[in-house]
């Protein structure tokens, strides 16, 4: 079937990734040892379990996951965590040195030494697939390993499997919550790579996730566990159509075809409804209108950009649970008609919806939202400003040049990011003037006919 190969890199990527596997194991009825003990009544859980799992001897299911890091700490905690025993031991690839939040170490020195070991595991997993659909990579862009080594791996996989989909779940540096001083450097260098080598990037950031935890879930002290719970719900929603039967299916390629009008503009905002905290899931059952209303709400977006400040080029909604497709279509049309100014008018019907019959554990219905909005430029713009402020003074540059990088690379990354912002802006504005010219011509035609 259409397999997906999952790669997680760096501390952030590994923590999100292991949370994701907890959710997927739960949905497919796989216990922490890899044994299936779901509801025996139906084969739905097993029917397409091969999207994410290999079947090993003795009927055990093993995640098709590659775990990489430049230091052993996070790996050790995954191994001793709730699902540590389910992964294939050979698929843990780690160094001892760490990348020290330095993109150059992850991309050029330490990471480059480890990358062949990672690629061997990736190859082995890919060769076992019947029909590999693509890769999903979890990483952050602010550190050293996820950003530097993550993008190195993405470009190597791109070389070897040019026709497979490459999807990333990338955690961007947050505006207010900064983890390291050199985040703007690492993020800009990473985006420079992602623009060229990834097919679809789901943009996440911690601040937006914190806001959801405070505002919507009323958690007073959210932990990374709570944040990762939100992310993993979204990740599971994006691929549910592949794993469970549905009325309108979607896969990574269909998603890309429907969401990406121009190849460089593949950075998506994601949202999820209903937003629930880890403890309170069993009490929620929303109707289709409620799901729709929640999922288009700016407060539900998992990255710090406000869709009301831009326009949607395209969007995709994935509903889960027993519901009428007619109602889904009506609600989606309703959103577009009521908020038509927030959608570009030169792509008609730019919202795609899909429906999967099996809801996530503990909910009757849910929906995942993926939007390609021009307002995402706010995030790039913010990082770019911070980058420029430091780069102008050449602050912290010696850490990068010391690993063999050239200043030229920084300049290129900076201008690539600024080009990206300009492209988003261009398509955000590409409406009124073009429309007016067009209407003017039409007016002439009418006069001409009379």
UniProtKB/Swiss-Prot annotation:
Mg(2+) binds at residue 71. GO terms for molecular function: GTP binding; GTPase activity; metal ion binding; structural constituent of cytoskeleton. One of its GO terms (cellular component) is microtubule. It is found in: Cytoplasm, Cytoskeleton. It comes from the Eukaryota. GTP binds at residues 11, 71, 140, 144-146, 206, 228. InterPro entries: Beta-tubulin_BS, Beta_tubulin, Tub_FtsZ_C, Tubulin, Tubulin/FtsZ-like_C, Tubulin/FtsZ_2-layer-sand-dom, Tubulin/FtsZ_GTPase_sf, Tubulin_C. Keywords: Cytoplasm, Cytoskeleton, GTP-binding, Magnesium, Metal-binding, Microtubule, Nucleotide-binding. Its cofactor is Mg(2+). Residues 429-450 are annotated as: Disordered. Gene3D superfamilies: Helix hairpin bin, Tubulin/FtsZ, C-terminal domain, Tubulin/FtsZ, GTPase domain. Belongs to the tubulin family. Dimer of alpha and beta chains. A typical microtubule is a hollow water-filled tube with an outer diameter of 25 nm and an inner diameter of 15 nM. Alpha-beta heterodimers associate head-to-tail to form protofilaments running lengthwise along the microtubule wall with the beta-tubulin subunit facing the microtubule plus end conferring a structural polarity. Microtubules usually have 13 protofilaments but different protofilament numbers can be found in some organisms and specialized cells. This is Tubulin beta-6 chain. It comes from Gossypium hirsutum.
């Amino acid at each position: 079937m259409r397999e997906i190969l999952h790669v997680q890199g760096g501390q952030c990527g590994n923590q999100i990734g292991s949370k994701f596997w907890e959710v997927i194991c739960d949905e497919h009825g796989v216990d922490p040892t890899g044994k299936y003990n779901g509801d025996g009544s139906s084969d739905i859980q097993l029917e397409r379990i091969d999207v994410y799992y290999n079947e090993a001897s003795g009927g055990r299911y093993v995640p098709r996951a590659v775990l990489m890091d430049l230091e052993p700490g996070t790996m050790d905690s995954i191994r001793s965590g709730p699902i540590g025993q389910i992964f294939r031991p050979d698929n843990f690839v780690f160094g001892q040195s760490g990348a020290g939040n330095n993109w150059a170490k992850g991309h050029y020195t330490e990471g480059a030494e480890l990358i062949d070991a990672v690629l061997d595991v990736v190859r082995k997993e890919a060769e076992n697939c019947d029909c590999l659909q693509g890769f999903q990579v979890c990483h952050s862009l602010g550190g050293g390993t996820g950003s530097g080594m993550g993008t190195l791996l993405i470009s190597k996989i791109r070389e070897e499997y040019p026709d497979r989909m490459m999807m990333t779940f990338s955690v961007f540096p947050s505006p207010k919550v900064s983890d390291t001083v050199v985040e703007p450097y690492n993020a800009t260098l990473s985006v420079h790579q992602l623009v060229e080598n990834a097919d679809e990037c789901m943009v996440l950031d911690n601040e937006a996730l914190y806001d959801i935890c405070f505002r919507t879930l009323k958690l007073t002290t959210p932990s990374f566990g709570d944040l990762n719970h939100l992310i993993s719900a979204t990740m599971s929603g994006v691929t549910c159509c592949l794993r469970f039967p549905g009325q309108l299916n979607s896969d990574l390629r269909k998603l890309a075809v429907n969401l990406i009008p121009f190849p460089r503009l593949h950075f998506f905002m994601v949202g999820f409804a209903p937003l629930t905290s880890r403890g309170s899931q069993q009490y929620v059952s929303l109707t289709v209108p409620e799901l729709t209303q929640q999922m288009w709400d700016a407060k539900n977006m998992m990255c710090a950009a406000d869709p009301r400040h831009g326009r949607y080029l395209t969007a995709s909604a994935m509903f889960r649970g027993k519901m009428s497709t007619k109602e889904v279509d009506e609600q989606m049309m309703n959103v577009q008609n009521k908020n038509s100014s927030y959608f570009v008018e030169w792509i008609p019907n730019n919202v795609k919806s899909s429906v999967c019959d099996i809801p996530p554990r503990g909910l009757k219905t849910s929906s995942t939202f993926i939007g390609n909005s021009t307002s995402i430029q706010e995030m790039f713009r913010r990082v770019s400003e911070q980058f420029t402020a430091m780069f102008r003074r050449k602050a912290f540059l010696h850490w990068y040049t010391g690993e063999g990088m050239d200043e030229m690379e920084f300049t290129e990354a900076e201008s690539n990011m600024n080009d990206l912002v300009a492209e988003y802006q261009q398509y955000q504005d590409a409406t009124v003037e073009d429309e007016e010219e067009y209407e003017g011509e039409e007016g002439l035609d009418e006069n001409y006919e009379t």
